[in-house]
UniProtKB/Swiss-Prot annotation:
Annotated positions for site Interaction with sigma-70: D246
Induction info: Autoregulated. Binding of the cAMP receptor protein (CRP) is required for full expression.
Protein name (record): HTH-type transcriptional activator RhaR
GO biological process, one term: rhamnose metabolic process
Signal sequence coordinates: none
Miscellaneous section: Its activity is regulated by L-rhamnose. When this sugar becomes available to the cell, basal-level RhaR binds L-rhamnose and becomes activated.
Lineage, uppermost ranks: Bacteria, Pseudomonadati, Pseudomonadota, Gammaproteobacteria, Enterobacterales
InterPro entries referenced in this protein's UniProt entry, alphabetically: AraC-bd (IPR003313), Homeodomain-like_sf (IPR009057), HTH_AraC (IPR018060), HTH_AraC-typ_CS (IPR018062), RhaR_RhaS-like_N (IPR047220), RmlC-like_jellyroll (IPR014710), RmlC_Cupin_sf (IPR011051), Tscrpt_act_RhaR (IPR023699)
């Protein structure tokens, strides 16, 4: 087995007293599978890419939020103008008396959902705090580490307030149409999605919404939905014993032959080849 790449805190933190830092990815390039000896929060600002976390693929774009534990293995591939920020931290160095474990899924290797979404309002507020955190964590002045940790605590609580699961934007949310569209797409894995119906319900222009989506994500709406479904199919092929025809249905493809064509085009191998190759990892 190939040696697992591991990123070390000595290469990313200014001192062994620093608990928090910000690592920009403008843009994020393809990055091989790796682990760390620190943890990170990942927030995607725009563009798209394939994020594989613990063998589960996610097609990511603006608003995606991940909580990554040190032992998690992840990689980035098929990136397209993918812009994100990593807020990296060492749990053992945090000194503030906050309920870190309650606010950060997977904190100290506890069980927790790693993937969430942020709407435009949450993203705007997070970006402001991250800007302050990035500035403070790069300072070499008294109490810079303490100030950075205070800002990190603020960011963690802010994310806790605004995050939601990818397919369930709160009904009372005042988020933008783009946020609501991405949520609706994530909830349409098995069922057909009709953009014209969505636009009628939202009283918006289909043409304008298509333009906004492509500008922010680097993909068309159909491309995004297709790739989200393929990612789900990859996961089911590796981690379930469902027949390929049943997986096709679970992922919104009425015709299993068409599913195979799309899957092969997106991944470079047939569903059965993918299953055989990846079953060897389990």
């Amino acid at each position: 087995m190939a040696h697992q790449l591991k990123l070390l805190k000595d290469d990313f933190f200014a001192s062994d007293q620093q608990a928090v830092a910000v690592a920009d990815r403008y843009p994020q390039d393809v990055f091989a599978e790796h682990t760390h000896d620190f943890c990170e929060l990942v927030i995607v600002w725009r563009g798209n890419g394939l994020h594989v976390l613990n063998d589960r693929p996610y097609r990511i774009t603006r608003g995606d939020l991940f909580y990554i534990h040190a032992d998690d293995k992840h990689s980035y591939a098929s990136v397209n103008d993918l812009v994100l920020q990593n807020i990296i931290y060492c749990p053992e160095r945090l000194k503030l008396n906050l309920d870190w474990q309650g606010a950060i899924p997977g904190f100290n290797a506890s069980a927790g959902q790693p993937h969430w979404r942020l709407g435009s309002m949450g993203m705007a507020q997070a970006r402001q705090v991250i800007g302050q955190l990035e500035h403070e964590s790069s300072q070499h002045v008294p109490f810079a580490n303490e100030m950075a940790e205070l800002l990190f605590g603020q960011l963690v609580m802010l994310l806790n307030r605004h995050r939601y699961t990818s397919d369930s934007l709160p009904p009372t949310s005042s988020e933008t149409l783009l946020d609501k569209l991405i949520t609706r797409l994530a909830a349409s894995l098995k069922s057909p999605f009709a953009l014209d119906k969505f636009c009628d319900e939202a009283s918006c222009s289909e043409r304008v919404l298509r333009q906004q989506f492509r500008q922010q994500t680097g993909m068309t709406i159909n491309q995004y939905l297709r790739q989200v479904r393929v990612c789900h199919a990859q996961y089911l092929l590796q981690h379930s014993r469902l027949l390929i025809s049943d997986i096709s249905t679970e992922c919104g493809f009425e015709d299993s032959n068409y599913f195979s064509v799309v899957f092969t085009r997106e991944t470079g191998m047939t569903p059965s080849q993918w299953r055989h190759l990846n079953s060897q990892k389990d």
